[in-house]
C-alpha cells in the first residue's frame, strides 16, 4: 500500500472552495482516509498555499506535510524525481496528485492499492460531469484525470513535462491505466449506486454544478444543512 505522495498545489486552482472547503483541504482529508501518511506539497505559489496548510484541521491532523517551492510553469518530471524520498528502494511507488481537482475517495483508494505504475484515466466521462471535465487532457486511454502512481526507475529515466510523460507512458504501455469508467458503481457505505467521479476545480459558472455533484455523493434525496458542511 502506498503511503507517501507528492501534491501539486498552485493558487488559484488548489484554493477554490466548494461547499466551504478548498480543493487542497478536501484532498488532504481524503488522502489521510486512504492511508497516506506523508505528503510533500510542491507549489509555484508557496505563500497562499502555506497559509492554507497552516489552518487547523482535525480531519487531516495525522498527515505529515512538507511544503516545497518550484518555478512557475508546467510541472516537470525532474521536479518530481528531486522530491523522491532518499531510499527509493523503500518507496517503490509514489503517488503524484494535483490539488486543483476533486476525486471520489473510492478512486484514490483503488489507485493507491495498485502494485505497479498506474495512471488514473476516464474513457467514458458520465454526462453529469462532462462540463466539469472538458478541460482535462485527452490520452489514448481516455481523459487524463491527474493522479498517477510512479516508479522511481521510470520517472528518473524521463525528461520533460509530467503531463507529456504520463501521456507517452500510457501510449507505449509503460504505465498501466486505471479507468474510472470500469470501476464499480455500488457505493457500499452509501448503500446505493453512484458513478465514481472526478473533476478539475470548476470555473465560477460551473461551481454550483460541482457542489451538486459533491452533495449528491454523500446522501440520498435533497441536501440538508449538515450534509452541506460535511461534503
Language-model features and meaning:
Residues 8-11, 41-46, 70-71, 96-101, ...:
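Structural motif
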Residues 15, 64-69, 74, 94, ...:
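Conserved beta-strand scaffold positions in the cores of enzyme catalytic domains, especially
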Residues 1, 43-46, 101-103, 168-231:
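Left-handed beta-helix
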Residues 11-15, 30, 46-48, 73, ...:
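Short acidic, S/G/P-rich loop/turn micro-motifs used as interaction or catalytic elements
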Residues 29-33, 82-85, 109, 113:
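Surface-exposed alpha-helical segments enriched in charged/polar residues
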Residues 48-104:
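Short phosphate-binding loop-to-helix
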Residues 53, 89-91, 101-181:
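Conserved core of the sugar-phosphate nucleotidyltransferase
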Residues 1-50, 63:
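N-terminal glycine-rich phosphate-binding loop and ensuing alpha1 helix
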Amino acid at each position: 500500500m502506498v503511503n507517501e505522495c507528492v501534491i501539486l498545489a498552485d493558487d488559484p486552482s488548489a484554493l477554490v472552495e466548494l461547499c466551504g472547503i478548498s480543493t487542497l483541504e478536501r484532498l488532504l482529508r481524503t488522502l489521510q482516509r486512504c492511508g497516506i501518511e506523508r505528503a510533500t506539497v510542491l507549489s509555484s505559489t508557496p505563500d497562499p498555499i502555506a497559509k492554507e496548510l497552516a489552518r487547523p484541521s482535525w480531519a487531516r491532523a495525522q498527515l505529515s506535510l512538507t511544503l516545497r517551492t518550484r518555478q512557475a510553469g508546467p510541472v516537470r518530471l525532474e521536479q518530481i524525481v528531486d522530491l523522491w524520498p532518499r531510499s527509493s528502494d523503500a518507496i517503490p511507488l509514489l503517488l503524484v496528485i494535483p490539488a486543483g481537482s476533486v476525486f471520489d475517495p473510492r478512486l484514490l483508494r483503488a489507485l493507491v492499492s495498485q502494485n505497479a505504475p498506474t495512471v488514473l484515466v476516464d474513457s467514458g466521462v458520465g454526462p453529469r460531469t462532462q462540463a466539469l471535465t472538458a478541460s482535462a487532457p485527452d490520452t489514448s486511454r481516455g481523459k487524463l484525470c491527474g493522479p498517477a502512481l510512479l516508479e522511481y526507475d521510470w520517472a528518473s529515466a524521463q525528461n520533460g513535462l509530467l503531463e507529456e510523460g504520463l501521456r507517452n507512458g500510457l501510449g507505449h504501455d509503460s504505465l498501466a491505466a486505471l479507468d474510472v469508467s470500469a470501476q464499480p458503481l455500488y457505493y457500499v457505505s452509501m448503500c446505493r449506486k453512484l458513478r465514481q467521479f472526478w473533476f478539475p476545480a470548476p470555473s465560477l459558472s460551473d461551481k454550483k454544478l460541482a457542489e451538486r455533484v459533491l452533495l449528491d455523493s454523500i446522501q440520498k434525496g435533497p441536501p440538508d444543512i449538515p450534509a452541506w458542511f460535511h461534503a
